Amino acid sequence: MSLASSLVVSSNVELSPSSFGFLDSVRDGPQIPDSFRFSSRNRVPNLINKKQKWGNHSHSTELKYPILHESGYGSVIVASMVANPAGEIAVSAEQKVYNVVMKQAALVKRQLRTAGELDVKPDIVLPGTLSLLNEAYDRCGEVCAEYAKTFYLGTMLMTPERQKAIWAIYVWCRRTDELVDGPNASHITPTALDRWEARLEELFQGRPFDMLDAALADTVTKFPVDIQPFKDMIEGMRMDLRKSRYKNFDELYLYCYYVAGTVGLMSVPVMGIAPESQASTESVYNAALALGIANQAPPNILRDVGEDARRGRIYLPQDELAQAGLSDEDIFAGRVTDKWRNFMKNQIKRARMFFDEAEKGVLELNKASRWPVWASLLLYRQILDEIEANDYDNFTKRAYVSKAKKILALPMAYGRALLGPS
C-alpha cells in the first residue's frame, strides 16, 4: 500500500472554527485559501456521468432489494428501461442507484486486491499540520456530539481513525442539509448549490475551504471514499428546491437515495467490512444503501408529514395516495381518517422492510463499527412505533423517542454489535 501524499500547511494559515459559518461563502462563491492545500492523489474518478445514456443492464438477483419487489405497494421499482418521447433511454431510480452502488463496491474491491485488507493509509505530515488536523477533527466531534448524541456515543467504540472520519462525514452531510433546511434556506439558490459542489470537488482535490472541510479532505486521502455519493446528496438538495411532489415511489426512492442512501455509501468504506465476512462486497453495499435510507428517509418523511405540509411539501407517492382515496387537500387539512390510517400502515410496513434489509448488512461490518449503526437502527425503528402509538396522527403530533428509550437502546445495540457474520 503506497503512502499518502504529504500534507503541507503554511505556518500562517487561519481556519475559521465556525461550524456552519459557510453560507455566505456558498452564496458568493468558494474562496479556497492556497495556504491550506492537501496534495491531490486523484485516486477516485468521477464514476457516474448523470447525462450518460445507459444501455441494457441485467441485475443479479443477489443484489436486488426484495423489499422493492413485494406486491401491493403501488409503483414497484424495476430495472427495465423505456424510451421517452425524445428517443432517449429513461432509466428507473433503482437502475441509477444500482450503478452507483456497483461502482462504489468495485472501488473497494480494487483496494482490497492491492492491499490485502482495507485499512487506514498512513500519512507523512509536517508537525504543524497534525495539530491543525486534530483541531479540525475535534470540532467535527463536537458538532456530532451536539446534534447526534446517541450516534456519537456509539462511535466511541470505533478505532480513533475511523471515529474521526465518521465525524467528518457527518458534519459535511449536516452542513449540506442545512443549506436547504436551515435558518438561511430562503437565501439558497441552485447557483449556491453549484458553488457548494465546486467546493466539494476542490476538497476532494486536497484544497479545503475551512477547518471542517480540512477534516473531510484528510479523510478521503485515508479511506477509499468516492465523491459520487457526496455529489448525489447535493443533487437531493437541488430536488428540494425545485420539487415538492413525487408522483410515485420510484421518484421518491431516488430522492431517498440522494438525501439518505448516500450516507450509507459514504460510511461503509470508513466503517470497514468484517474480515470474516463471506458476503460479497456488492451485497454489503446494497445493504449499506438500505441502511442509509432506513435510518433517515422513511422515519423522517413519515414523522414530518404535518411539518412538511405547512411548507407546501408532500413527500409521499401521489399515486399511492390516490389509490387510498386521499388527496393533497386531505394532508393540508391534517385529517386523521381511517383512509389515512390504512395508508400509513402500508407506508410503515414498507419502511420496516428497509430496516430488515439494513440489519442483514450490519452483521458484515467491522466489529468496532457495528455499535453506532445498531444504535441508529434501533432508535429510528422506534420512530415508526411512536407514529403508531400516536394513532397515525403525524399532522399535529411529532413522534419522538424519549431519552429513557434512547439510553436503553445503547446496551441493546452493544449486545447486537457483538454478533458478527454467520
Curated annotation (Swiss-Prot):
Pathway membership: Carotenoid biosynthesis; phytoene biosynthesis; all-trans-phytoene from geranylgeranyl diphosphate: step 1/1
Pfam families: SQS_PSY (PF00494)
Catalytic activity: 2 (2E,6E,10E)-geranylgeranyl diphosphate = 15-cis-phytoene + 2 diphosphate
Presequence boundaries: 1-83
UniProt keyword Transcription present: no
Broad EC category: transferase
Oligomeric form and interacting partners: Monomer.
Family: Belongs to the phytoene/squalene synthase family.
Protein name: Phytoene synthase, chloroplastic
Lineage: Eukaryota, Viridiplantae, Streptophyta, Embryophyta, Tracheophyta
